[in-house]
């Protein structure tokens, strides 16, 4: 099977002046009238089965290998290395100003809550020395927490870089599997019904490009910046939200105009009807 010529062409390769749905109908009628149709159907089934199995295996490799590389390198290589450097060199607690602001706000809330609990009688009235000692203990706890967060961010950068390298290596040295996987994905997407295509298009656009998507992008950007220990600059986040979804919307509309409108015009019509 591995030496079979994969004659199953992707949907992109079948685009032309005649819509793909009409050409597939005529191809189906011609095959049903052909005397050797049964052998061809069995051969196509074997090729399709090989394509599906190979694509799923390759997809699992693309997911599992980078994840395993990330976790193993973080636990066994980068984790101990960063912890050693962090403890020996007494590195700074904070990597950026955003961490400082969150730490100071956390300490301030603790102090205010302490005074509030004493005022309402939830805690007995404490002396100034005891209050300062509790605040000091909380400050040390917060300092340790953010030192761990800073070290973890450095580990994330190194481990994620190793994951990206392993992912690119899989794509670089698995070109045949990648081409089979691309063909499988194209056939799967363009094999959906027009209603299903329109549904997923609307779901994608409303989720990533819709009027409510900026809130999701804001949360996502804050999480990504914090993951890598980068400053959570509000101006940068708002600039990203103002430009990236627009660029994504432009690419998506171009895809509809350039490919989907020729491959499946009925799906485009269904999409417009459902979107109205």
UniProtKB/Swiss-Prot annotation:
One of its GO terms (cellular component) is chloroplast inner membrane. It is found in: Plastid, Chloroplast inner membrane. Keywords: Antiport, Chloroplast, Hydrogen ion transport, Ion transport, Membrane, Plastid, Plastid inner membrane, Potassium, Potassium transport, Transmembrane, Transmembrane helix, Transport. The chain crosses the membrane at residues 59-79, 199-219, 236-256. It is a multi-pass membrane protein. Disulfide bonds: none annotated. GO terms for biological process: potassium ion transport. It catalyses: K(+)(in) + H(+)(out) = K(+)(out) + H(+)(in). GO terms for molecular function: antiporter activity; proton transmembrane transporter activity. HAMAP family: CemA_PxcA (MF_01308). PANTHER family: CHLOROPLAST ENVELOPE MEMBRANE PROTEIN, CHLOROPLAST ENVELOPE MEMBRANE PROTEIN-RELATED. Contributes to K(+)/H(+) antiport activity by supporting proton efflux to control proton extrusion and homeostasis in chloroplasts in a light-dependent manner to modulate photosynthesis. Prevents excessive induction of non-photochemical quenching (NPQ) under continuous-light conditions. Indirectly promotes efficient inorganic carbon uptake into chloroplasts. This is Potassium/proton antiporter CemA. It comes from Cyanidioschyzon merolae (strain NIES-3377 / 10D).
